[in-house]
């Protein structure tokens, strides 16, 4: 039996991560421990044991996590949240000294991968496609850059170099909302006008560094990837429907260009185990990089249905049981989310 600890078990992808571990191709029995900063985290009803932990920024976080690992005889830790990666990757050796593997890339690789600006610079240096961009540090620089990218005739993207999920992302579009859209569409909170964004940014005592980039009108892709001692592979999927940053409808599309970009960039960064990259097509159908997620992605469970369980590959690699042959990846695969829930009566949980 393998004892697995998953962090951030209140994250939207928790059920998928557990599914990938429980439905591993080696038929290994697994015992899953979950931790989260939120005592109400929904994942507590999906794991065998649950613990509340301090925030990753808390100096006590690592020691609390280690104590839980020792108590539960944990074999491997799987970090799920971006904000935890820094603290956990800094302490890989600390866990290793206590006989615990951590499925995370080295600290330096994590710091590079989590920085969207550094990813853009990396792709530029490697000669791989990336959106045209400009770094701005003031209102005047923001206004000039946005206009240079074609606003208001063209939409423009603004985002901070380091953020989690869709935090800080805005698409600048002239007349972003009118009465017709107001009455017919649900608000997304992403689209604003330039003046609306400036109004927000003026309500503070500092101006954050921001990336202004061209808007890519085509399909968005997420690539689930694995890099181990002997093998590496990548599985692109089209994100046909995205709700609040979460993939609800996915279709596997094994595009060789995105596979090559992902594996080439990940080698340069020094990524290990499982991780993801996101791309979007420009007006000519060329995939350009958006960001890297150096961790388990929220919909990485889709890979299970291709015959290439990316998460389990990472677990085996972390435990010193590397795969020697690449899996046979099926291409005619879709993955769709549906709303579900958990009812809790007198402490007993039942899924619907």
For each of these PLM feature ranges, what is it?
Residues 110-209:
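Active-site nucleotide/adenylate-binding loops and adjacent lid/helix of ATP-dependent enzymes
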Residues 162-163, 215-219, 270-272:
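A short catalytic or substrate-binding loop motif that flags glycine-/basic-rich loops and adjacent residues
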Residues 1-104:
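ATP-binding N-terminal substructure of ATP-dependent carboxylate-amine bond-forming enzymes
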Residues 183-245, 252-263, 280-288:
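Phosphate-binding site of ATP-dependent enzymes
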Residues 2, 8, 72, 241-244, ...:
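ATP-dependent carboxylate activation and anion-phosphoryl transfer catalytic cores
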Residues 1-5, 155, 211:
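Residues that mark the start of a beta-strand
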């Amino acid at each position: 039996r393998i004892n697995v600890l998953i962090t951030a078990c209140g994250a939207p992808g928790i059920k998928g991560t557990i599914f990938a571990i429980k439905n591993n191709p080696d038929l290994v029995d697994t015992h899953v421990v979950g931790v989260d900063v939120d005592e109400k985290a929904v994942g507590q009803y999906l794991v065998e044991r649950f613990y509340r932990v301090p925030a990753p920024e808390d100096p006590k976080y690592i020691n609390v996590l280690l104590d839980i690992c020792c108590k539960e005889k944990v074999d491997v830790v799987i970090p799920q949240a971006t904000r935890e990666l820094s603290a956990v990757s800094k302490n890989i050796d600390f866990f290793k000294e206590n006989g615990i593997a951590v499925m995370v890339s080295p600290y330096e690789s994590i710091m590079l991968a989590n920085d969207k600006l550094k990813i853009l610079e990396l792709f530029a240096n490697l000669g791989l496609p990336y959106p045209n961009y400009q770094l701005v540090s003031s209102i005047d620089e923001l206004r000039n850059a946005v206009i240079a990218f074609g606003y208001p005739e063209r939409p423009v993207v603004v985002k901070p170099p380091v953020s989690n999920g869709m935090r800080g992302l805005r698409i600048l579009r002239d007349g972003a909302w009118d009465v017709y859209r107001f009455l017919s569409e649900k608000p997304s909170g992403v689209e604003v006008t330039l003046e609306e964004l400036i109004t927000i940014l003026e309500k503070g005592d500092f101006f954050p560094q921001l990336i202004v980039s061209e808007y890519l009108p085509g399909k968005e892709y997420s690539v689930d990837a694995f890099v181990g001692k002997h093998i590496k592979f990548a599985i692109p999927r089209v994100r046909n429907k995205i709700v609040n940053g979460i993939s609800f409808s996915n279709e596997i599309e094994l595009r060789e260009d995105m596979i090559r970009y992902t594996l080439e960039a990940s080698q340069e960064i020094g990524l290990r185990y499982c991780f993801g990259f996101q791309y979007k097509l420009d007006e000519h159908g060329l995939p350009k990089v958006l960001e890297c997620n150096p961790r388990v992605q929220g919909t990485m469970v889709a890979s299970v249905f291709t015959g290439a369980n990316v998460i389990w590959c990472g677990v085996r690699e972390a435990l010193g049981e590397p795969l020697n042959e690449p899996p046979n990846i099926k291409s005619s695969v879709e993955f769709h989310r549906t709303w579900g829930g958990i009812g809790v009566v007198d402490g007993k949980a039942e899924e619907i």
